[in-house]
Swiss-Prot record:
Motif (Cx9C motif 2): 147-157
Residues in CHCH domain copies: 123-165
Lipidation (N-myristoyl glycine): G2
Subunit structure: Component of the mitochondrial contact site and cristae organizing system (MICOS) complex.
Organism: Caenorhabditis elegans
Full protein name: MICOS complex subunit MIC19
PANTHER family, per the entry: COILED-COIL-HELIX-COILED-COIL-HELIX DOMAIN CONTAINING 6, MICOS COMPLEX SUBUNIT MIC19
Transmembrane segments: none
Taxonomy of the source species: Eukaryota, Metazoa, Ecdysozoa, Nematoda, Chromadorea
Motif Cx9C motif 1: chain residues: 126-136
Keyword Lipoprotein: yes
Length: 169
């Protein structure tokens, strides 16, 4: 007898789904005890506890970022309106405070965009494998098949790196 046959297996309740159109009219009213309702709610809450917390935190971060972007957009719109109002009237010199405010908003926006889209660059983790292949090809011109075993290690490295990127590590 194997270990899996002698060990107790976890009893999982079977899930039953019933469509309303499959139920005869006389059985459409079904009473469910509060115990059943609490068990269903408890399994639903227990199964998603960590995931729901993570999603709530992510949603809160995104909402904060969205609020900051809206504030910046509103400030930029106000500045744009002031600018167009100034152009349509008479050419008015920009005050020092207005200029500083515009510069600060612009710099903050540029910094946020750079941080969000351009800040993180992954290093070439497969550089060693790549260098070996290039060196082999240079040492063996016209004999590409001699370098074929090196490509397996390179492809494995690239595949692992791709999985890490997709997982978000």
């Amino acid at each position: 007898m194997g270990a899996s046959q002698s060990a107790e297996q976890e009893a999982r309740p079977e899930v039953v789904r019933i469509d309303r159109n499959e139920i005869p009219e006389e059985y459409k009213t079904v009473g469910v005890s509060s115990d059943v309702v609490s068990r269903v709610n408890a399994t639903r809450v227990a199964g998603n506890d960590g995931e729901s917390d993570r999603l709530r935190q992510e949603l809160a971060r995104e909402r904060e970022e969205k609020a900051r972007l809206r504030e910046d957009m509103a400030k930029l719109s106000q500045l744009q309106q002031r600018k167009t109002a100034g152009i349509s009237a008479a050419p008015v010199s920009i005050s020092g405070n207005d200029l500083e405010e515009r510069k600060k908003i612009f710099d903050d926006t540029v910094e946020r965009v750079q941080k969000q889209f351009f800040a993180y660059h992954r290093e070439n983790v497969c550089q060693d494998n790549e260098n070996e292949i290039v060196r082999c090809l240079q040492e063996n011109p016209g004999r590409v098949l001699k370098c074929a075993p090196l490509t397996e290690a390179f492809e494995k490295c690239v595949g692992e790196f791709r999985q890490q990127v997709l997982k978000g590590n």
